[in-house]
């Protein structure tokens, strides 16, 4: 018995020795710097019903572009923005010719390279065919404990280290590999299918290196570096999405970058998601001899906005609603933006009226009209901004063009009746501040106006917007550092004098068909009021007045 016990003891000792040898020390897991709770992965069955069936979008024999990532690519289970957060994968398809290639977003919030590979990848891989493309952007969640809680950390680095763990909550055993090893496994699996893998670095967070907030924190010493190293060794493309977007954020500045995110510092708003999607497309387009680029839509060049620019001269852009731009012909309704050039020295400055009837500040932005002006801006240009007439009413039904009232930082997610999609709506003043920040970013001059007065009277006094849109416009301008002209007051004072001295019949000649839209005479009156206001402020635009 003693000999048997000794033999058994020897075997146990050797077994333990071998286990210790197999479990040589590995690097500690990465710290969870995001501190964001995302339980999406905990509902895998629900997630599978929400995500597309792999390969189901394929048209004939066309290739499919599969997106593999986490919540920065697809937020939550549905990825539909119902919490105000959007992943860039939702908008990626807009950059591709979907008659030649389709895009499927298989990302899932809360996943790491390890958990995606173990739980979701086998199913995605089933849909991958020869000639397809797979973009892999993972790493945000490769942190925390190896063997408890979310148990999603990969071993830092790209080495061959491994670690056998037993998940404390479930008792399930699992071998954990390095981040680089998971990337290599993705790559090998894709190549075996005859498809093309692409690695991307992580989207940047709203984090800055310096006290002045001029340098965005990169991942070029961790996940970005490791993905790049693996891509090089495996001879696959690497696109530094982190660097491309971070450079844009640094141009935007800290205040503008804030609204690129929603609720936290890692998950993007629609604005930020669209920036990341554009950066991904830019990286694909600029990567030398990357065949995926041939499926991108051609870049559409705007040949209209800013086309009047004379060499060495600024442009005065006007944006707003129908009181700024209307029919602008004959005896019809006119907007002041179509006549203000009469008061400018057009040998030294050109004037372009980009207002559109029926628009609020929000819908002018949502329809992409502002983007055209923004992209055309050059240092030294001027932008006259006037909204307010169409910014009240329904937010998500009917015309659905209103904002939240006020000029604060509030926002709310609404389900839009017309589109069936979720959208974050901000205050009226927020949209004005965005326009102002964008103008200043380009080195141009923003001038914000309270909206034109209506031909509405109460006990002999013309109606003014002093306590509503006028006040919110002034507040937004002052907070964002723009010039403010109280157009509503300047013109209202003139109309008040006419109404008091000569009767309302004379005032009526300045309007057309209703109490809001102006005749040519009224448009010229408002244009003159703007010039009067410019002369009262210390704005360089006064140097271009006749």
Predicted regions and their residues:
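Bacterial Sec-dependent N-terminal signal peptides
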Residues: 1-25
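A short, charged, Gly/Pro-tolerant segment at domain boundaries
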Residues: 297-304, 546
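Serine-esterase "nucleophile elbow" of acetyl-processing enzymes
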Residues: 28-107, 122-134, 153-154, 302-356, ...
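N-terminal post-signal-peptidase region of extra-cytosolic proteins
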Residues: 112-123, 360-372
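Short, solvent-exposed loop/turn segments at secondary-structure boundaries
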Residues: 77-81, 211-218, 328-331, 364-365, ...
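Acidic helix-start/capping segments at beta-turn-to-alpha-helix junctions
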Residues: 108-113, 207, 356-361
């Amino acid at each position: 018995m003693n000999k048997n016990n000794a033999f058994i003891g020897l075997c146990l000792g050797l077994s333990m020795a071998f286990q210790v040898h197999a479990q040589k020390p590995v690097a500690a897991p990465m710290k969870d710097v995001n501190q964001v709770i995302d339980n999406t992965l905990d509902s895998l069955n629900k997630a599978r019903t929400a995500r597309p069936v792999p390969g189901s979008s394929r048209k004939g024999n066309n290739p499919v572009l599969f997106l593999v990532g986490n919540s920065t690519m697809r937020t939550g289970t549905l990825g539909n923005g119902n919490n105000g957060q959007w992943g860039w994968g939702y908008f990626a398809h807009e950059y591709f010719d979907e008659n030649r290639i389709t895009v499927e977003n298989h990302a899932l919030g809360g996943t790491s390279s390890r958990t995606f590979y173990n739980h979701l990848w086998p199913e995605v891989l089933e849909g991958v065919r020869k000639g397809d493309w797979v973009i892999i952007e993972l790493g945000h969640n490769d942190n925390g404990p190896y063997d408890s809680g979310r148990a999603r950390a990969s071993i830092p680095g790209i080495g061959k280290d491994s670690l056998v763990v037993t998940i404390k909550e479930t008792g399930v055993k699992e071998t954990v590999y390095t981040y680089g090893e998971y990337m290599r496994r993705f790559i090998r699996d894709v190549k075996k299918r005859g498809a093309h893998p692409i690695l991307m670095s992580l989207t940047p967070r709203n984090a800055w290196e310096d006290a002045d907030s001029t340098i965005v924190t990169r991942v070029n010493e961790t996940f970005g570096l490791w993905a790049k190293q693996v891509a090089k060794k495996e001879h696959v493309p690497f696109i530094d999405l982190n660097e491309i977007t971070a450079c844009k954020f640094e141009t935007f500045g800290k205040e503008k970058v804030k609204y690129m995110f929603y609720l936290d510092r890692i998950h993007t708003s629609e604005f930020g998601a669209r920036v990341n999607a554009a950066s991904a497309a830019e990286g694909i387009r600029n990567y030398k001899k990357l065949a995926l680029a041939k499926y991108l839509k051609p870049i559409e060049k705007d040949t209209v906005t800013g086309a009047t620019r004379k060499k060495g001269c600024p442009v005065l852009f006007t944006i707003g609603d129908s009181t700024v731009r209307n029919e602008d012909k004959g005896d019809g309704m006119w907007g002041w933006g179509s006549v203000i050039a009469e008061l400018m020295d057009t040998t030294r400055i050109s004037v372009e009226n980009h207002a559109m009837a029926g628009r609020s500040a929000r819908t002018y932005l949502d329809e992409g009209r502002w983007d055209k002006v923004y992209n055309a801006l050059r240092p030294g240009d001027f932008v006259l901004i006037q909204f307010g007439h169409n910014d009240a009413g329904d937010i998500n039904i009917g015309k659905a063009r209103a904002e939240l009232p006020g000029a604060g930082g509030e926002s709310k997610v609404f389900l839009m009746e017309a589109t069936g999609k979720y959208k974050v709506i901000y205050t009226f003043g927020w949209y004005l501040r965005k326009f102002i920040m964008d103008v200043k970013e380009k080195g141009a001059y923003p001038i914000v106006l309270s909206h034109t007065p209506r031909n509405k009277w109460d006990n002999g006094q013309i109606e003014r917007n002093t306590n509503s849109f006028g006040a919110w416009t002034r507040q937004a301008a002052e907070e964002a550092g723009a010039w403010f002209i109280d157009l509503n007051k300047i013109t209202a004072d003139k109309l008040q004098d006419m109404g008091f001295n000569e009767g309302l019949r004379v005032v009526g000649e300045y309007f057309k068909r209703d109490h809001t839209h102006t005749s040519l005479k009224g448009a010229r009156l408002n244009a003159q009021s703007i010039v009067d206001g410019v002369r009262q402020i210390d704005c360089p635009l006064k140097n271009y007045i006749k």
